[in-house]
Amino acid sequence: MDYIYTPKLHIKMKIQFDVLRKSRELILKELEGLTLDQIHVTPEGFKNNIAWNVGHVVVTQQVLHYKMSGLNCLCPDDLINDCKKGTSPTKTFTEEEFDEVKDLLMGLPDTLEEDFEAGIFENYDEYPTSTGLVLDSLETAIVFNNFHEGIHYGIIRAIKKFV
């Protein structure tokens, strides 16, 4: 679906970028005080751990926004393979590796907004989500991604109670 860039669309999207940045800040805050061992614990009743969830939100945002627009993702392929939809934790991050994931977590929202404003997203491959929603534009993908990150923020908070 083609969208005409208008000031009204810009304002609505600015709010979405702000929501994305805020969700990332909240996720990062949940990591405070946790050890490397704690973020890799998968409590009974859960399918994944905190480290995987953090990697997953980074990867999903990149796949939904960049890959589905026919562009290269801005995170490493290894991270995508380890944390994409349908995977479970197999990777144990070193402190340095997880710091890199946290840097991506916090830096990529600004890059997305800059790229959006620069108009690099010219195409979007329709994507049916597992929720039944069909993403047909970058704008709908950004809104959906914010919903998705809220889910994983809640999962991180729940796991944190058990580690």
Give residue ranges: language-model regions:
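Acidic/histidine-rich alpha-helical segments that form the ligand environment
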Residues: 86-124, 140-145
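Short, contiguous alpha-helical
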Residues: 2, 17-21, 28, 38-85, ...
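Short coil/turn linker and secondary-structure boundary residues
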Residues: 34, 48, 93-96, 136
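Surface-exposed helix-capping loop/turn segments at secondary-structure junctions
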Residues: 33-40, 114-125, 161-163
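Hydrophobic alpha-helical core bundles mediating ligand binding, dimerization, or RNAP-core interactions
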Residues: 20, 24-27, 31, 105, ...
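N-terminal amphipathic/basic-hydrophobic helices that include classical n-h-c signal peptides
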Residues: 1-12
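Generic detection of long, well-ordered alpha-helical segments
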Residues: 10, 17, 21, 54, ...
